[in-house]
């Protein structure tokens, strides 16, 4: 297993996103859910998978003691470890790496952790801690106080696909956030020409590159639903140069043969939506190709005026092979979602 310092975070992200096309498969914004846990006396296990960065308020106390934005168990655990089981928000995934963040847990942080996983075909989520199907995918490693631990599996993506994750904390303590990155296994199509959102993260889409994401992550473009406020969209900083544009390149969940329509949604962006947008597509010839959307771009949606807080629907109805799309916003601003409906 390889660990990365914060100075090497760019390399870590390159391995996760560019090389392995992985996303955080347990996060709550994708529908990840805490199924069960051994203990959460001081702070809720559900905090682990929240998309926001952890915060600290040293003046705040609750019935159990000092308030912490994370998962914290009680002292003096008589068992070997505490644990939490999380159901992925995607159908299944192959795991490559992750992050354990002990932010603000200092003197009460988790000394060691390990990660196990299993695959379950049922939908009821009735998974128990001592299920015989659990396999270790990240070996036990040491955690320090109030710091981020970035790691990648030494032997690459797991060969097996998984649906559930078990985080083990030895022997007890606190963890602020838990991210686990994997390549999504899309659900099987009912028929070959079954129309789906090819730019939906749960169908395997990944945001590969972007010009800027100052106020909101480009990954948010691919999330389910229309969100709840501006925080869960993609937003760039204000531009001051004439002719400026911002852009995002997205690898579709599968290569298209037909595109029915494209939707660009500016939900909740009312005074900061882009003035215009364009959408282009290109075809990456093979998985081994170094091309990540830098080929010949073909116009799918020409320069179009946008408005605040609405879905902009562009009828395409064209047979076209596309593996990547490029959303360009002119000159800058915020977009909530992009949908590429086709097969």
Swiss-Prot record:
It catalyses: allantoate + H2O = (S)-ureidoglycolate + urea. Pathway: Nitrogen metabolism; (S)-allantoin degradation; (S)-ureidoglycolate from allantoate (aminidohydrolase route): step 1/1. This is Allantoicase. The keyword Hydrolase applies. Induction: Repressed by nitrogen. The keyword Disulfide bond does not apply. The lineage of its organism: Eukaryota, Fungi, Dikarya, Ascomycota, Saccharomycotina. Belongs to the allantoicase family.
